[in-house]
Amino acid sequence: MTHTTITFDIPGTVQLVDTQGVLDVKHGSEHTNIVLVPQPSSDPNDPLSWTRKRKTFNISWVMTWCFFGAAIISGLSPAYLQIEADTGISVADLSTGNGLMFLFLGWGTLLTQNFALNYGRRPTLVYSMVTMTFISLWTAYVKSRAEFFVNRIIIGIVSSPMETLIEVIIDDLYFVHQRGFYMGIYSWTLWCGAFLCPVATGFIAEDLGWRWIQYILSIIGGVVTILTFLFFEETMFYRPSSQTDVRGIPDQQRGLFGSDKSAIDTERSEDQKPQPAEGAASVNSDIETRTLPNRVNVALEKAFWSKFKLWGYQDDRKSKQLKQSLLPFYLLRFPSVIFAGILVGGILSWYNVVGGSLALILGNPPYNFGSNVIGLFYLASVIGVSIGCLISSWASDALSVWMARRHGGVMEPEHRLWLCFLAIVAHPVGCILYGVGASYQIHWVGIAFGLALISVTLPLGTSMAFTYILDSFKDLAGEGFVSAILIRNTMALVFAMPS
């Protein structure tokens, strides 16, 4: 006996767990009571229907792009004192330039995200990395405060896809019950790219001079551009909203998924048990099809060479570009978007405080550390970020599934937010250790420990906020990310300005 869900319009509320195995929809293969949200189509070009190997290969290159993109914009921080001595640009002005970069890293998404949503993820990533490579090379030759500010503004705009596009690609490739894990991986690559790069660039600045930081990063950017062009496939796929969700069940149907087992006949004969569609196991190990008739794929898979093109991905069925570019401002009316923006805004603000003050604190008495040792302090951040990502990636999905089972199989976007309580404790403790501890000139171990505690909360807040938007505003998630980033990076500029 099978049933089909009846929808009701609560954004983000979906039937995630088929507690009695009666829904006539596609399920996961490893956990066969997990309903696939969104439901994959029969089109072979649908990224949701790709094999696990193909998905992993593509997301790996996206994360590689993100890691080195974050590295390119973060490599200078250990060398601020050297840059000041060489160019006359003060550390305060360098910090202000860093703040301007983060401001336009957010506002630049109005351009780059709109381009990616209309013309494709692949051309956006390739064009962005090409431009970042040349701007990074230019940075080695800046000679004045004004030129440095312009340089930082431009690199902020062209590198902005790392802020909002990676989340959209995760949405293209993965189902609701898998997104938390990959959001955690994304947070790790983003923050560790920003933190590991200064570890290396501190030694580069000490041995070769600060300009070699930009030379080496430009070479890396060129290599990443070529690899992205060769190996990353386009993931943009038009999916009508009416076909994407298995939404929550109304109250009158909750008995089908609650504890009242007498409401349905759960006994099935062997020939009535759900069977995967023909070829399903060989096509995609993430998908099991239950009691669905076999369909003939009328769409043909793209030719191999067509996957290399950087044009022709626009779909006429999508909304107009002008209207789409204004949506991020419209979404600022919603409290959930404002909440997500303030959450990640507070996190980035404190990251800017750390990035702008670490060299000043550790390069002066009583510590007097060189650029190489200052760079090593970012290893504390890497440890903290890794712990935070482990919590946010694994626990986020596990918690949402567990909460859904407790609520008759229905998942709400707010179920993931319980993990934020960890950040509420760790973040203020880390800030006190780092800031107040430095003012009292405590041992450097205490400062490193405070840095690690602050860093634990970076992926927690980022992953929770963006996954919350993705779950709540599925059809407008790309624009919702832009809305949150506008709030976040505007807040970060205020914290980055010298007092």
Q: What residue spans do the PLM features occupy?
A:
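Pair of pore-lining "gating" transmembrane helices in MFS-fold secondary transporters
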Residues: 55-75, 153, 332-333, 337-351, ...
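Hydrophobic alpha-helical segments of secondary membrane carriers
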Residues: 65, 185-189, 220, 229, ...
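A generic transmembrane-helix signature of 12-TM secondary carrier transporters
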Residues: 66, 129-136, 151-152, 187, ...
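C-terminal transmembrane bundle
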Residues: 70, 82, 86, 99-102, ...
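Loop-to-transmembrane helix entry/capping segments in MFS-fold secondary transporters
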Residues: 91-92, 176-186, 371, 475-484
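Cytoplasmic helix-loop-helix junction between adjacent transmembrane helices
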Residues: 153-190
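Helix-loop-helix hairpin linking two adjacent transmembrane segments in secondary transporters
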Residues: 191-243
